[in-house]
Amino acid sequence: MSAQTSPAEKGLNPGLMCQESYACSGTDEAIFECDECCSLQCLRCEEELHRQERLRNHERIRLKPGHVPYCDLCKGLSGHLPGVRQRAIVRCQTCKINLCLECQKRTHSGGNKRRHPVTVYNVSNLQESLEAEEMDEETKRKKMTEKVVSFLLVDENEEIQVTNEEDFIRKLDCKPDQHLKVASIFGNTGDGKSHTLNHTFFYGREVFKTSPTQESCTVGVWAAYDPVHKVAVIDTEGLLGATVNLSQRTRLLLKVLAISDLVIYRTHADRLHNDLFKFLGDASEAYLKHYTKELKATTARCGLDVPLSTLGPAVIIFHETVHTQLLGSDHPSEVPEKLIQDRFRKLGRFPEAFSSIHYKGTRTYNPPTDFSGLRRALEQLLENNTTRSPRHPGVIFKALKALSDRFSGEIPDDQMAHSSFFPDEYFTCSSLCLSCGVGCKNSMNHGKEGVPHEAKSRCRYSHQYDNRVYTCKACYEGGEEVSVVPKTSASTDSPWMGLAKYAWSGYVIECPNCGVVYRSRQYWFGNQDPVDTVVRTEIVHVWPGTDGFLKDNNNAAQRLLDGMNFMAQSVSELSLGPTKAVTSWLTDQIAPAYWRPNSQILSCNKCATSFKDNDTKHHCRACGEGFCDSCSSKTRPVPERGWGPAPVRVCDNCYEARNVQLAVTEAQVDDEGGTLIARKVGEAVQNTLGAVVTAIDIPLGLVKDAARPAYWVPDHEILHCHNCRKEFSIKLSKHHCRACGQGFCDECSHDRRAVPSRGWDHPVRVCFNCNKKPAWTSLSVMTGKGPLC
């Protein structure tokens, strides 16, 4: 801490002498002040004293011109806060303490202490010094805000415009470990919200855009970082503006309010309107009802080390008038905050979510507006960490991201309530039961967390949706509710044995706890209805996107077809290699001489697509090269190659050059005549067999359609894969997911698992999405007792 005193430092405080006299006689000029030694010290005394081990860590400061120390007796009352501790006016030479005027009167006004010698400090020099320091501090603050710029945080469609935490911190231009608070502003459009923020936080610089035109210059939510107060300042779009998507933009305001520590409501009206109180009251109610729970969930889900207080932000109502008096001016005995609470109570609004509500008014006789009172009130609230403590910018971004993910999406106009600024429709799920029309009571996007739809009332039965669910009666009487479905066979039966039992004794109802509780044809006669004996019926809601409940899960016919297809496919796959080899060899033997052999054709001659083992290679009758089906789908006569006047397959290039005749000699035609005859005979046989196969495929398709389970999408309605959107063709086969019934390609549905809720107790084909879900989701969706399917 010690250093050599420069000649310039000598004479700065000629009236302040060393108060220690430890290494000097007390005649040396004081250079340092030690707050813990409670004395002014010269250079030598400061060095000698603080060489001692117990005094080494004392906090010392170098004196400035006109320095006056703090009162030592005030130190214990208010700590080290400047502006609270009083400056000393004298120093008692006997007690060796500095005293302010009040402490001197209290401790040295009577007794022997009245005679203690004192040294008087020059307070007039102190005042000039403090004013100079204040001016220097103001200049420093203005310089700190010179490079501050605002950025669009959320647009008018509730889309966050920063990609991640790092991008948010980079645009704020603050350190990642910087602790900061959030201050936002609300109010009607045109009341000067952006102008207020510019003058309150940024000394009049236009950080947030302002405009004298009628159009609103603030669209969406903009943010900037105030390095002086260490606060993220957020500017919002005005209320009562001529905008589209009004409901979504109003909901966006509450998201900003939820992440704020301090809220300014700016009003330029001569009298406080009811809209102000309704907005704050409705915002408080919606905050407690919808956002408190989500903020708690965000804390747990994101592992945030700083708790997001369930108590909302502090509110300052900044009221600027021109022609009328400020609130409370005609009632000096009542504070404005008391009058504010009375207005809330009269309107039936109770702003319980806010930690405090303050009123700060200013009357502007002549512009510009005085923002000094608002600035002082803001600084006091920002220093108060009792309710909301500063946090890292990453925590702020996570909270905003969580609220945006949860409360997003369009708000239907027919569901919107106009009696409140923040109706429940802004935050609750918009799904309606298809049977009874009751809405879901959960928050928006609850399906992302696996939470099913729920309603406040019970549903009614609809024959159209058959919204019944069977539960095991024995388990229900034992205190457990277990859903069951009719199906072809029991889970303990093998596929073929299950089909045999189904043919003999009908469908079964199986409970996971009780086993098989019912068979439809267990006896020759006298079989009772399961509802009367082993199951109970429950009527459940029908939510959009969910399948039926007691739809026919008897899949015996489809299981039989699957078994036959499996055997046929196994034989086909085993014989595919030898069959293709023999076919290629036989084709080469009867091919014309100018055709390229199949063994040399590895890819399409035009599009260069590589041929797989089961792909068909086509020869152009004009040039003889190998092509895929799409590059050789055109036909035209090729008489120059001996194919006569009938149209035959040619590639796209030869079709476009059909007017150019190939120069072939008569000798070539004669040489190719024999092979052409053999090839024509081979094609005639192939076409005949193809027609027979097509004739067989038509009734086979009818059989498959008849065997299709009720929840499967019909084949003729499936045009492309439900997952990758590839269009189905001759080469791309359709496959049904046994869980959801949608159509998929083989790549998107190659997983295998049991689907007991659909009657498939053994591993069967399912799509990627259904394979990720728990095994019991299909039924839990119906009853509302599990995650969303």
Swiss-Prot record:
Keyword Magnesium part of the UniProt annotation: no
UniProt-annotated location(s): Golgi apparatus; Golgi apparatus, Golgi stack; Endoplasmic reticulum; Preautophagosomal structure
Binding site residues for Zn(2+) 1: 604, 607, 628, 631
Residues reported to bind Zn(2+) 4: 737, 740, 767, 770
Residues involved in Zn(2+) 2 binding: 620, 623, 651, 654
One term of GO molecular function: phosphatidylinositol-3,4-bisphosphate binding
Protein origin, superkingdom: Eukaryota
InterPro entries assigned to the protein according to its UniProt record, in alphabetical order: P-loop_NTPase (IPR027417), ZFYV1 (IPR042427), ZFYVE1_first_BBox1 (IPR047856), ZFYVE1_second_BBox1 (IPR047855), Znf_FYVE (IPR000306), Znf_FYVE-rel (IPR017455), Znf_FYVE_PHD (IPR011011), Znf_RING/FYVE/PHD (IPR013083)
An annotated GO BP: lipid droplet formation
Pfam families assigned: ANCHR-like_BBOX, FYVE
Sites where the protein binds Zn(2+) 3: 721, 724, 745, 748
Zinc finger (FYVE-type): 598-659, 715-775
Annotated GO CC locations: endoplasmic reticulum; endoplasmic reticulum membrane; Golgi apparatus; Golgi stack; lipid droplet; mitochondrion; omegasome; phagophore assembly site
Annotated region (Required for localization in the lipid droplets), positions in chain: 416-788
Transmembrane segments: none
Function: Plays a role in the formation of lipid droplets (LDs) which are storage organelles at the center of lipid and energy homeostasis. Regulates the morphology, size and distribution of LDs. Mediates the formation of endoplasmic reticulum-lipid droplets (ER-LD) contact sites by forming a complex with RAB18 and ZW10. Binds to phosphatidylinositol 3-phosphate (PtdIns3P) through FYVE-type zinc finger.
Entry protein name: Zinc finger FYVE domain-containing protein 1
Annotated organism of origin: Pongo abelii (Sumatran orangutan)
Gene: ZFYVE1
